[in-house]
């Protein structure tokens, strides 16, 4: 993040030659990563570490997905490199296995749609960010970076915590993404350690607030729940106890990251994870879809009860 530099931009997008390559994108979440020319992305107001939309024309309209610019190159300005993984390209940009080849597309600086209601966002297959904040709260911020149909029900959980606790002490930052027929995750997901506030204008307004606590609701495919983040372990234990009490399925394990039972990529401990950048006491909760669907609000209640007691009121 510290490598990112603010520069004035003079346009919002550029036509690009998308080159598909092997073994060039740095390790990590390469399906969401791209490499671009620094001067060219600066022209659209973006920089290294920030997000862009990459669009590809199709017979039925436009295929698009969000990408993070993880590195830059000094070749022709309009060249953008993506990893040549056929499954990822099919899911993200609708490239069929028989037609995985370089293409001409567009790189757009706009990440979130502006001025849409939640219903309009769903109807338009779009992606928005919502912020509920009184301008001075420093107690708690609850977030769902992957709401809508990206990681279903997580936005409802974050909204419920905000409704249950006093708005004077709780802020909410929630993103919602949709795609008819499925595929919202492939189109709109940006991993939490990559999220740049420079690509999310509403998030940027609260990034330097230094909240006392932050909570992030997430979904994953593992049939369990992981409680992680930088919040003290004794608070994680309280959260686990509260969640176990409301999740009635004994087959769903509720683990904490310090027990080393959570996959490293999902333990929420990274300092650049957005939940930990918002507060030194960041709490990340990863949940399988079954618990989100049938116990999501109960889990949100449990989290609100524990964190609510800790906020300085």
Residue positions per predicted region:
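Short beta-strand-centered segments at strand-helix junctions
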Residues: 11, 19-52, 72-103
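Basic-flanked hydrophobic alpha-helices used for secretion and membrane insertion
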Residues: 65-73
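N-terminal catalytic or cofactor-binding beta/alpha core of small enzyme domains
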Residues: 2-8, 12, 94, 106-313
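Terminal interaction modules at protein C-ends
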Residues: 59-61
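A generic structural signal for residues embedded in beta-strands
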Residues: 53-57
